Amino acid sequence: MTNIRKTHPLMKIVNNSFIDLPAPSNISSWWNFGSLLGICLILQILTGLFLAMHYTSDTMTAFSSVTHICRDVNYGWLIRYLHANGASMFFICLFLHVGRGLYYGSYMFMETWNIGVLLLFTVMATAFMGYVLPWGQMSFWGATVITNLLSAIPYIGTDLVEWIWGGFSVDKATLTRFFAFHFILPFIIAALAGVHLLFLHETGSNNPSGLSSDMDKIPFHPYYTIKDILGALVLILALSSLVLFSPDLLGDPDNYIPANPLNTPPHIKPEWYFLFAYAILRSIPNKLGGVLALVFSILVLALMPLLHTSKQRSMMFRPISQCLFWLLVADLLILTWIGGQPVEHPFIMIGQLASILYFSLILILMPLASLAENNLLKW
């Protein structure tokens, strides 16, 4: 009798994706982040669902409903902080996942990569709208500043902003629609992640060497299921430590002040995971130029397959490209730091230099280094 997991229409899909899937024998812990992102998404949907049971999306009661969750709901504080810090863990895993893709040339799987870039945009949009919901000072002013960027679009900009706001300023209509979008988007993300996986399984996983692993595959279960469980335990340990010991470490104290349209905070800044893009936005004095740079700072990832000039897929055996890659990582850390600083000397200049370096590395220096490395070897 054939095993039910190989014949049942539903079980067959699960079996071919997580049990009998042929996987390269040499993929390292950098390949754990896909499963960790799946765990993060499930955690966010579950905690978000329980928060939505007690949250009210009205400007008069939103802030106090979050306070009510933390004070009066059984383990409400835990659910709220798991959700807030779960978002941070989500982005840490996302950045590491994308970094892995850049380092090992995973972007050569075009469909998988492009859906990944779309997923990144969707997750960023979801996180931004979620940050608005507690209706604290930083929620309100963050929403005002970021949505206002659309007014830089010629001709339709102002109308577009007022259409998104549902009025002439960020108000009740804005909060209600942001809550609606914030609720629906994670399910769209889950569907996109399914398509992401579908395209990945068409080609099979990449591996650290960047060479074909068709001659040396092993079954996903038990080898990589046990490895993913270890990764999940490390993630849960890190998240638990953050939530239980310093839940407000990554948050902004200003968000504990109820939103007040008449009082602007001294430094408006988004959550830490958007600071690198925010620094790039601020480094350009022109409004439209800044918005374009902001969008392109993420969209540039979609160009990676076109910018690949090396004859090798992975950076594993390319020392010059490795140096430039880690320079890019350092540059992103500098941009993150600058994004959280006030707009004054010397931070303005550092931000501008770091922004120039960011685009130069990706668009010019790394492709040139790859060409140089091609000439260093006899092919």
Curated annotation (Swiss-Prot):
**Function, please?**
Component of the ubiquinol-cytochrome c reductase complex (complex III or cytochrome b-c1 complex) that is part of the mitochondrial respiratory chain. The b-c1 complex mediates electron transfer from ubiquinol to cytochrome c. Contributes to the generation of a proton gradient across the mitochondrial membrane that is then used for ATP synthesis.
Additional note from the record = Heme 1 (or BL or b562) is low-potential and absorbs at about 562 nm, and heme 2 (or BH or b566) is high-potential and absorbs at about 566 nm.
The record gives the membrane topology as: Multi-pass membrane protein
> Which species?
Mogera tokudae
**What PANTHER family does the database record attribute to this sequence?**
CYTOCHROME B
Listed name of the protein? Cytochrome b
Q: Where in the cell is it found?
A: Mitochondrion inner membrane
Tagged with keyword Iron? yes
Q: Report the GO terms under cellular component.
A: mitochondrial inner membrane; respiratory chain complex III
Q: Which UniProt keywords apply?
A: Electron transport, Heme, Iron, Membrane, Metal-binding, Mitochondrion, Mitochondrion inner membrane, Respiratory chain, Transmembrane, Transmembrane helix, Transport, Ubiquinone
Primary localization class, coarse: mitochondrion
For this chain, the family text in UniProt reads: Belongs to the cytochrome b family.
